[in-house]
Amino acid sequence: MSIKLFSLAKELNVGVGSLAGFLRKKGFDVEDNNPNVRIENEEFDLLLTEFGKSLPKGEAERIRKKFVKQKQGTPASAPSAKEETAGMAAKEAQVIATEVPQDMRPRFTIKGKVETEKPAEPVPSPKDKEPDTVREDKPARETAPVKEETKVVPVKEDKPKEEKPKQEEPKREEPKPEEPVQAAPVAKPVEKPVDKPQQPVMTQKPQEAETPPPAQEMEKKEDTEEVFRLKTNTQEPQVKVVGKIDLSSINSSTRPKKKTKEDRQREQNDADGKKKRKRINKAAVDVKKEAAKVSGEQGKRNAGGGNHPSGNKNNNRPAQQQSNASGGRKNNKRQSLPPKVEISDEDVQRQVKETLARLTTKKTSTTLGRGAKYRKDKRDAASRAAQDAMELNSEEQHTLKLTEFVTVSDLSNMMDVPVNEVIATCMSIGMMVGINQRLDAETINIVAEEFGFKTEFVSADLVEAIAPEEDNEEDLVARPPIVTVMGHVDHGKTSLLDRIRNTNVIEGEAGGITQHIGAYGLKLPSGRRITFLDTPGHEAFTAMRARGAKITDIAIIIVAADDDVMPQTVEAINHASAAGVPMVFAINKIDKPAANPERIKEQLANMNYLVEDWGGKYQSQEISAKKGINITELLEKVLLEADILELKANPNRRAIGSIIESSLDKGRGYVSTVMVQNGTLNMGDVVLAGTCHGRIKAMFNERNQRVKQAGPSEPVLILGLNGAPAAGDTFNVLETEQEAREIANRREQLQREQGLRTHKILTLEDISRRRAIGNFQELNLIVKGDVDGSVEALSDSLIRLSTEEIQVNVIHKAVGQISESDVVLAAASSAIIIGFQVRPSVAARKQAETDGVEIRTYSIIYDTIEDIKSAMEGMLSPEIREEVTGSLEVLQTFKISKVGTIAGCMVKEGKVKRTSKVRLIRDGIVIHTGELGSLKRFKDDAKEVVAGLECGLNLAHSNDIQDGDIIEAFDEIEIKKTL
């Protein structure tokens, strides 16, 4: 038994890492970060025994049975079915093998006699040659051989011994399809040797009677084919094949009696010519006797129209072919059956059934019958093809054709599974993902398999199109480490970088929070270089942090000493550990009076991250980024981690790296921030990144200074791409621009196909669900931003705001200024345009005013999310709540013409307003709900009546008021719904 560790972890409700760690303690070699690793019986028993203790009673046994059933149930059943079919085939083969030799022996011995006796007889040799010449001419002359095939139908009944072996050997029927036609030519050679003496021929024919059978046998084969086709419809039981073998054995036993009848026929031929003709037809074995053929032709001439009725009665082929003699022969054969009855009653019944079966097939084997059979076969083939197509479609429905790095939302749409379930599955295997985060192939396989889908990646050829270059050991040189600063928002990530770089980046960020992923190169006083990546800490920038962890070598996790380990900090730690990146913990803000670094270390220890001060393996440093305390010590620890990793790269090769950010600059075009991971990037190189390509026109470092080349671990800003590649894409340097263009075009085509696959069409189920909800709303948004990472993060956050009643759709997202095309799209789809740190052009603003399209611009992601939330709350239908204001008792009723029933009431509690809605209650049952028609105190109209006072009133649209009824007054209050 071999099962995936991930499947067992899910059943035991234990993390994969815990199971792997336990197995390693027991001496098994198990990978820690691979949930797909398979375990055997011994490991399975150990895990179930150890972790099954905490399960409810009987749960461990249920899990054991489940996996044993999964692994043993299906494989065992399939082979057994094959073995049974093989066994049945073997049994049938054995039954046939016992009976076939008995049928084959007389046939082969007789054919051998024919060949030995032919050279001895000079007379039959010319006879044999003449039919041969006629046979060669005949097929060329005759255009309708079918008529002559059927003439020999009676012969099949007289010689059933040869039918059955032929059916057992269907391969012999195919090589000689034209020989049945040769049976008819026998009629012409008969005319030439008519004058020859018949008696010597008759004496020799019993032995030579087997020379013509090859032609007759082939005719019989076609007839037997018809019988065989009839039985092909019921071939499944395979019992009828055995029955045919038995019949052949019976017929072989009747064969010698036919020879004795020939002797009798010779005696009767001299006495009576009529009987002679009939019995010659009866002994169809001797059809090729020249004398018998002459008599057969005479019978045809004499029997002319008299035998037509018999042919019609039989409804067989001879009726169509003017073969009157054949009809007569069949009648004679039926009369000749009684002497055969002497053998056995059972044999007779079998033979009669076979004959009737042949006759019924003959009725349907007319020209019309053949057409019907052809149409039926065609219908059967069409139905089988349709069934196969349905099975293929069902398989295709459970096969996902996708490109690698599909987003979570696209994957959920293709599987028709809620996004939350996909995210929960990813979290169960230790991956923190967002809605718009792209997954790699291995993760997609795991998630799809969990929901019962198979995956087929259609972009594998494009990945292989760029062949990786191998580096020689002697070419590798040390490279600077890439360090990512990660942590919760406002915990001091950017302040630390400011202190290290002696700049002030925070002032340039809107709202004082980092909204872009920044890359900075730094040269230390010791001469060593470090590349820093600053990631956003806000919860919306999950994908950015994941990208930062993917391309980094070392992660600095910053935690504020006066705060706790916050959710984004935990998420950053998970990203770094999932990527296998070593971490250094920096406890910031120790200069504050409320700082408590020991509490932070305790919280980290509770998460299984022990720092070195507490006996663990993770380095930590207490710092103050604002005052510059212990910054040098922190950098030394980072360099120590880098020395342990032995980071190397080959600068003498074409560059490869990752896209950190991309944006659209009005003066410079599309600008991309890239991190070179290996090789050297030069001016003029042809770069391919995702679906974008181009030749580098200019390169700038993080201080906006021009550079001509960038080595490993250097971040640079490049100009020249024809679009804004997605953040996180890998870029490659290719030899020619044509090659880059071809690959980019194919990738773009695949991306469009992927978009069509993930486009979800509104189904009846969705419509019924919306009808059930009632007031279903859709909010369409177009998101434009300054950089790709911010657009992705904002779109992710906005889509997450969707509820059951309001669905948020980001119909378009892009980098750059808000243009006229965005306004046109928004007008067509009733969408709102969200601009994040971008402004609309003059033409776009005028177009928006004309079309009535709303454009909202923001600089801080918090404000954007809050505004969209409030807009969605305004779209929600308000919640209506009833508030009872008072109750009245009807003391007496008065009926007034043209007015209706007036009720004199006493207000028991609360007060009754003229505008209040009322409910009439009788014996605790609501009789009527409506509004007041009038409310009076004495003769004056009253706006309200308080408790303890009497009043008169009548109900609008109702006069059914009785003494003793209770009237309840209430107001409906609309309460604004919140998300």
UniProtKB/Swiss-Prot annotation:
UniProt-annotated stretches for the region G5: 624-626
Q: Which GO terms describe its molecular function?
A: GTP binding; GTPase activity; translation initiation factor activity
Which Pfam families does this UniProt record tie to the protein?
A: EF-G_D2, GTP_EFTU, GTP_EFTU_D2, IF-2, IF2_N
A GO cellular component term found in this entry reads: cytoplasm
Give the residue ranges for region: Disordered.
68-392
Q: Where is the protein situated, by its record's location annotation?
A: Cytoplasm
Tell me the domain of life: Bacteria
Q: What does this protein do?
A: One of the essential components for the initiation of protein synthesis. Protects formylmethionyl-tRNA from spontaneous hydrolysis and promotes its binding to the 30S ribosomal subunits. Also involved in the hydrolysis of GTP during the formation of the 70S ribosomal complex.
NCBIfam families found in the cross-reference section? IF-2, small_GTP
Instruction: Output this protein's name.
Output: Translation initiation factor IF-2
Q: Which organism is it from?
A: Porphyromonas gingivalis (strain ATCC 33277 / DSM 20709 / CIP 103683 / JCM 12257 / NCTC 11834 / 2561)
Give the gene name.
infB
